[in-house]
Amino acid sequence: MPTINQLIRKPRQAPVEKSKVPALKACPQRRGVCTRVYTTTPKKPNSALRKVCKVKLTSGFEVISYIGGEGHNLQEHSVVLVRGGRVKDLPGVRYHTVRGSLDTAGVKDRKQSRSKYGAKRPKKA
C-alpha cells in the first residue's frame, strides 16, 4: 500500500484499454477493396457456410470481414465499407461489411431490420 506522499509523486496509472478493432484506427468505418470472397465454416456446435471476404483497408490493414444477410453481390476488387463487430462463431472475423453502401448491394426483399441490411422501404401495393 503506497503512502500519500508516494501517490503525490507518482499517481495511480489507469489501465490502458486495448482496441477490439485496431484496423479501423479509431474511425467508425473504413473503406477497403475485397481481395478474396469465400465461405467458411463456424466453430462447434454450429454448422453453416458463412460468407466472408478478405479486405485490404485504406488504413493499410488486411482483415476478414463478415457479409451479413441472404445473398450478396461481392467479388474480388469490389469496394466495400467495413465496420467493427465480431462474429462469435467465426474465429478471426472481427469486422462486418456494411450492406447497401459503396459496391455492396442491400438485401433483396428484406422487410424487417431493413436499416441493418441496406434495404429500401417496400412500395405500398
Swiss-Prot record:
GO terms for cellular component: small ribosomal subunit. The keyword ATP-binding does not apply. Gene3D superfamilies: Nucleic acid-binding proteins (2.40.50.140). Residues 113-125 have a biased composition (Basic residues). PROSITE patterns: RIBOSOMAL_S12. The keyword Ribosomal protein applies. Transmembrane segments: none annotated. GO terms for molecular function: rRNA binding; structural constituent of ribosome; tRNA binding. This is Small ribosomal subunit protein uS12. The lineage of its organism: Bacteria, Pseudomonadati, Pseudomonadota, Betaproteobacteria, Nitrosomonadales.
